[in-house]
Every structure is written in structure tokens, then in C-alpha cells.
Swiss-Prot record:
Belongs to the intron maturase 2 family. MatK subfamily. The keyword Cell inner membrane does not apply. InterPro entries: Domain_X (IPR024937), Maturase_MatK (IPR002866), Maturase_MatK_N (IPR024942). Pfam families: Intron_maturas2, MatK_N. Usually encoded in the trnK tRNA gene intron. Probably assists in splicing its own and other chloroplast group II introns. One of its GO terms (molecular function) is RNA binding. One of its GO terms (biological process) is tRNA processing. Keywords: Chloroplast, mRNA processing, Plastid, RNA-binding, tRNA processing. The lineage of its organism: Eukaryota, Viridiplantae, Streptophyta, Embryophyta, Tracheophyta. GO terms for cellular component: chloroplast. It is found in: Plastid, Chloroplast. It comes from Anthericum liliago. This is Maturase K.
Amino acid sequence: MEELQGYLEKDKSWQQHLLYPLLFQEYIYALAHDHSLSGSIFYEPVEVFGYDKKSSLALVKRLNTRIYQQNFLISSVNGSNQKRLVGXNNFFXSLFXSQMIIESFAIFXEILFLRALVSFFGEKKVLKYPNLPSIHSIFPFLEXKLPHLNYVSDILIPHPIHMXILVQILQCWIQDVPFLHSLRFFLHEYHNWNSLLITHKKSICLFSKENKRLFRFLYNSYVSEFEFLLVFFRKQSSYLRLRSSGTFLERTHFYGKIEHFQIXHFAFYSSMSXLFPVVXLKXPFMHYVRYQGKALLASKGTHLVMKKWKYHFVTLWQYYFHFWSQLYRIRINXLSNYSFYFLGYLSSVLINFSAVRNQMLENSFLIDIITKKFDSIIPVILLIESLSKAQFCTVSGHPISKPIWADLSDSDILDRFGWICRNLSHYHSGSSKKQDLYRIKYILRLSCARTLARKHKSTVRTFLRRLGPGLLEEFFTEEERVLSLIFPKTISFILHGSHKERIWYLDIIRMNDLVNYSXLX
């Protein structure tokens, strides 16, 4: 990592020679085993077509050597006009090689962007918050901000139609033309291989797991670009109150226009002048949060301001990212009568009305008080549907056994069910209605008992009577043990009203697969 940092510092033109260290610098291939780096980058090794070897930069080095030594030809496959990369008369070997190179492109780009991010925060001297990466850290923020706001826009960020759009976004960061052309080439080959293997169910199943890292990197680049423009227009809205920002869509010199922000840089195009009028966007108390492809934009402004932001979002996606977005992807609602799904919770702002009698001397009068409180509950129906897809219960919520786990040992079955139950209980600890969480735990408890009874060819009642109810006690005592550690002095009161207590754990860095946002959108 130090050698890569030295290369970046010595050669300031690394953006124009991005492919050089990947192909010719030996030390790059040691980064795959750098533990300090793996802690900063989420690395998920994947298997390719039954190969036991994982994605490794060292493997890419050997593949590059093969490319130098052998004659990799561009030939047609099955007599079609589409050109594919075929080496040593082995299509699948060539496919494996290209997938490894694509994976290495993503790893190396992550390294460079991580270095740029670290240097940026180092220059800005931003304070480091250890709990900031936690997903649950969003909810205390929503608890503090949303009760004071009026409207919220529920946004589903659209996906670009063509992969070339994602590559074009990288052009503002990377000026290495061979690297970009290579990336386009392998993405084109990926599309061809995908269409070729569509008839082979086993192959397409394994192939669908590939290149997640690259696509995630490209998608994150797209979202980062979108949010960068959003923040810029938000900050400059007061300055651009009477001016058009259509010329900012010329992204090649966008950063230069920011650094030298002068009126002389505005070149008003007649065709774009009406597309991005930034007028009356200086809304007070504007807040934006996002997880994956879903975002929330809340404001204390009026409904008209939110409609203008909606118009700007659609225009930005259409004329800058070159794809059409349906209007239903952005829904504007008043927080007083709207509930939204976000991060596996059904959240809303509750309004409580109360009256206080005030007496001064001989006069008494009533004062009406309105209080707003952020509330989050578990979407039980959707969570039961997720459990049903995972074969823990029926669609109606009736627990069933899991036959695929019946061949495991008793301890493995208990560990798996206990892990899922603790995971859901840990993640949904912020729900204001714990009875719904107890219902989910009850389904998992009976599903575990039915699975064990199925394995031992017995009934659930007979199995529990023989081993005792303490066998599944951990399904109900995990939360009480955590609460007893947090509130040791008031344990009796807390346990008595634990169904109303909400605790946000700040060590959760990913969502449970059963409550992924895509199932709630």
C-alpha cells in the first residue's frame, strides 16, 4: 500500500495512466493479501464455473503473462457476427481469464478511489466517528430531524439503461483512454457471454454471481456523481437564483468551473436554458439520507419547493445521465399523514395532542400542546413474506419445518435458527412495537422445533416434552440479556415495559437479507 501511495504521489498524472501499474507494476499484486487494505474495502471473493481459485490480483498477473506469451485471437463463435475473446481454443478458459481481469479492474479502481477519499478527508481534517458506518446511525438522525419537518420525498434512484453510461461517468475521474476502452470491451464481452450461456442453467447460475464487485463499483460511482451534483446545486441555489445551470451538464470541465466559479464561465445555451432553472430552491432545513437505491429528501419548505426538486431530479437523470425516469419513483407526501419504508422499518411521524391547564391567580385556562415523535415499527406482513420465501413458514405465517436442514446435527440446527433469530432481534430492536418482533421469533422457534422433530421422526409436542422447554430458551432471552447489561439498575422496570423500549445498536454495518430494501420498495 505504501508503494502504491508513493506511485500516486510521484506521478500526479495517475488518472491518465491508470492501466500501467495494473499491468506492469509487480507490487500491485501483493495488495490482494494486504490485511490493512482488506479492512477498508469490502472484498467478497467469488467462485467461477466451479474453480476453487478465488479472484486474486496475483492470478491476474499470471493471466497477463499468458496473454503476452500466447496468441489470443478475436474470432467469431457459432458463426455469429459477434466477436468474442477466445484463447488457446478454450472458450471457458478465456471467459475465466476475462472475468478475473474485470474483477481486478474493480479492485484497483477501489484502491485509487479509497486513496483519493483518504487524502480528501486528511486535507479537510474531518473528525472520525467510529459509529458512523453503522446503518442504525441513520435512525437517531431521523429521530432528531424529521419531527421538525413538513414534507418528505420518497425516492427510488433509477438504474442506468446501458452500462456505457456508467463508464462515461468515470471519465471525469479517469482520463486513461486504454483503461476505459478495456473496460468497455470486457463489459461488451460480458453481455455476449451472458447471451451465449442463457441456455445452460447451471452455467448461468454460476455466471450470475460474477462481477458483483465491478458492477457495485460502477453503480456507486453513478450514485456518487448524482449526489455530488445534488449537493452542488443545493449549495449554489442562492447564487444561481436567476441563472440557468444547464451548462453544468458539460461534465468534462465541471470541476474547473467549481474551482473558478465566475460569471464569465456561464455560456448560456438556448436549448438548455429552460431545463435547469434553479429558482426558489433555497429551502430551509433540507435533509437527505440514502441507503443503496432508496433515498429520502425531507424539508421544512412548502409542497411547491418539493415539486421543483422532483422536477430537477427527473431532468438531471434525463439530460445528464441520458435515461428516462418515471415520475412514480419520486413520491412527495406530508409527514403528518404518511408512512414510508426505509431500511426494513415502516417509519412515520406521530402527532400527539394534549391539553395543559394553567392557572394564574384566580384565572385558569387550557393550553393545547402538539408534540411530534418519530416512530418506527416492523412491517410484519412483508417480513413474514420474506420468511415464507426462505421456507420458515407459510404465506399466512404458519411455522413449517425446513427440510434442507434436517440432515444437520442438532447443534447446527439450533445455531442456525438462533443466529437468524438473534440477528433479526438485534436489527429490529428499534421498533416501538415489540409484540410484532415476538411474533417473528415465535415463528422461528416453532420452525426450529418442527425441523428437529422431523429429523428425529417425532412430533413437536413429544420432542419438547422429552428435551424440555429450555432447549429453545435463547429465542426469547437474548433481548432481555442485552437490556440487563445496558440498564442494570432499572432492570425490573425495563423488562416490565421492554415492549416499548427502543434501542439503536451502532455496530450494524449491513442489513439482514430477509429485510433488504428491494423487498419493501
